[in-house]
């Protein structure tokens, strides 16, 4: 009868669907994690004059990249060289916002692969270099990462020098003292004393 035929067709295709699912359920699409970085000219063309919207939209996408379509990717699997290029691109669109340096310093710096932290350090320093008197906080974050995570004391000291020299008058006093602390930790007590003496003379 027609009903039996339709039931047979339904069961037949249901079985085919189950077989197809069983054979393909372990196949995952190769979505990648960090997308390719466009050129600034491409960005300007596709932003249709609203670069700030592009900055916010793509910033949010980079914040969540790797955690889409049911995936949860560990930071050690991310291509930090691409992230670094994305961060630099965002700064070309808006270097006043603290959104991207915050994302870099407080989230992406937590990678399990400590060697990748150098990309975060370099970006934070370059970001702060554009406006040291207002962006000195990111020198401090870069210095902390260099000293405590990347374990490069000389790099940390070089950033601490930038922090000391660029901090404005209304910045906390410790921004100038950090260099002395790092020098003392390295056993360079005379240099540390010279820094502290200079600070005292400056505020005397």
Where are these regions (language model features)?
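Alpha-helical repeat scaffolds
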Residues: 81-82, 87, 116-129, 152-166, ...
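Soluble extracytoplasmic domains of inner/organellar membrane proteins
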Residues: 143, 150-157, 180
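Residue at a conserved register position within TPR or TPR-like alpha-solenoid repeats
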Residues: 107-111, 146-147, 183
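Membrane-embedded segments
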Residues: 78-138
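Long, ordered, amphipathic alpha-helical scaffolds
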Residues: 1-15, 181-204
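N-terminal alpha-helical interaction modules that lie
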Residues: 1-93
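Boundary/linker segments of alpha-helical solenoid repeat arrays
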Residues: 98, 131-137, 165-176, 201-204
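Structural register within alpha-helical repeat arrays
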Residues: 103-104, 142, 176-179, 183
């Amino acid at each position: 009868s027609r009903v039996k035929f339709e039931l047979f067709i339904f069961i037949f295709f249901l079985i085919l669907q189950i077989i197809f699912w069983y054979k393909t359920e372990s196949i995952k699409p190769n979505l990648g994690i960090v997308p390719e970085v466009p050129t600034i000219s491409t960005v300007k063309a596709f932003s249709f004059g609203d670069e700030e919207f592009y900055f916010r939209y793509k910033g949010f996408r980079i914040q969540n990249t790797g955690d889409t379509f049911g995936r949860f990717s560990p930071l050690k699997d991310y291509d930090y060289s691409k992230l670094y290029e994305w961060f630099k691109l965002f700064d070309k669109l808006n270097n006043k916002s603290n959104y991207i340096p915050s994302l870099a310093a407080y989230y992406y710096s937590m990678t399990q692969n400590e060697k990748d932290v150098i990309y975060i350090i370099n970006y934070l320093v370059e970001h702060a270099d554009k406006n040291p008197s207002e962006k000195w906080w990111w020198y401090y974050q870069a210095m902390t990462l260099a000293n405590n995570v990347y374990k490069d004391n000389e790099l940390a000291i070089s950033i601490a020098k930038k922090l000391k020299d660029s901090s404005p008058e209304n910045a906390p006093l410790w921004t100038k003292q950090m260099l002395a602390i790092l020098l003392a930790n390295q056993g360079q007590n005379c240099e540390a004393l010279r820094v502290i003496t200079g600070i005292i003379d400056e505020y005397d």
